[in-house]
């Protein structure tokens, strides 16, 4: 992940994004200075060099509009809360308070997540979800059969693939070493739907 930006650097980055979106080309240093209310182009240049050092843009000195937004900078980033831990195996009690936040590029997932949950256990490895992963979750109290969900059972939470029947629900692991969890439909609470994952940078 790139270094955190100051408020002013974020404003300059937003200015570049908007110019690319509206005009199809990056602004000049003079245009940035004018839009941002800087006294000179030098102030714009200072912020641009800082953005380059932090990995958001690449400057091309041989071009008049030589500002290239790197992919994650084009979409921007947002801080998503890590709100607890989910056992991918044996359900554990949810931790409701926010442990920390993690910067995630906007547009990384097809559906925008609400929060991240940390996986403990290996019951979903065949679905590509490993111990220590941060799963991106879209908050929802409904889900379709076949979706990977965060489910609450008796005030404990787990992540599994949901299979719905007429009067019951089955939470399916993605590891043959674990048994499916079958519960009455009226005792199952859906907390959210899995929309993707990122490897937790704090796990390495």
Curated annotation (Swiss-Prot):
GO terms for molecular function: DNA binding; serine-type endopeptidase activity. Represses a number of genes involved in the response to DNA damage (SOS response), including recA and lexA. In the presence of single-stranded DNA, RecA interacts with LexA causing an autocatalytic cleavage which disrupts the DNA-binding part of LexA, leading to derepression of the SOS regulon and eventually DNA repair. It is an enzyme of class 3 (hydrolase). Homodimer. Its EC number is 3.4.21.88. This is LexA repressor. The gene is lexA. Keywords: Autocatalytic cleavage, DNA damage, DNA repair, DNA replication, DNA-binding, Hydrolase, Repressor, SOS response, Transcription, Transcription regulation. Gene3D superfamilies: Umud Fragment, subunit A (2.10.109.10), Winged helix-like DNA-binding domain superfamily/Winged helix DNA-binding domain (1.10.10.10). It catalyses: Hydrolysis of Ala-|-Gly bond in repressor LexA. Belongs to the peptidase S24 family. It comes from the Bacteria. Signal peptide: none annotated. Residues 29-49 bind DNA. One of its GO terms (biological process) is negative regulation of DNA-templated transcription. The record marks 88-89 as: Cleavage.
């Amino acid at each position: 992940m790139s270094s955190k930006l100051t408020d002013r650097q974020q404003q300059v980055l937003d200015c570049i994004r908007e110019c690319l979106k509206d005009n199809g080309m990056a602004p000049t240093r003079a245009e940035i200075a004018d839009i941002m209310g800087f006294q000179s182009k030098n102030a714009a240049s200072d912020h641009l060099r800082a953005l380059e050092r932090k990995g958001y843009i690449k400057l091309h000195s041989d071009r008049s509009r030589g500002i290239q937004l790197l992919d994650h900078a084009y979409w921007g980033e947002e801080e998503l809360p890590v709100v607890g831990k989910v056992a991918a195996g044996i359900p554990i009690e949810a931790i409701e308070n926010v442990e920390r936040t993690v910067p995630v590029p906007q547009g990384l997932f097809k559906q925008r997540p609400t929060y991240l949950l940390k996986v403990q256990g290996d019951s979903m490895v065949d679905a590509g979800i490993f111990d220590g992963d941060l799963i991106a979750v879209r908050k929802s109290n409904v889900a379709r059969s076949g979706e990977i969900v965060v489910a609450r059972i008796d005030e404990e939470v787990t992540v599994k693939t949901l299979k719905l029947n007429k009067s019951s629900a089955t939470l399916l692991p993605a590891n043959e070493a674990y048994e499916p969890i079958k519960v009455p439909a009226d005792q199952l609470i859906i907390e959210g739907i899995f929309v993707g994952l990122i490897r937790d940078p704090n796990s390495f």
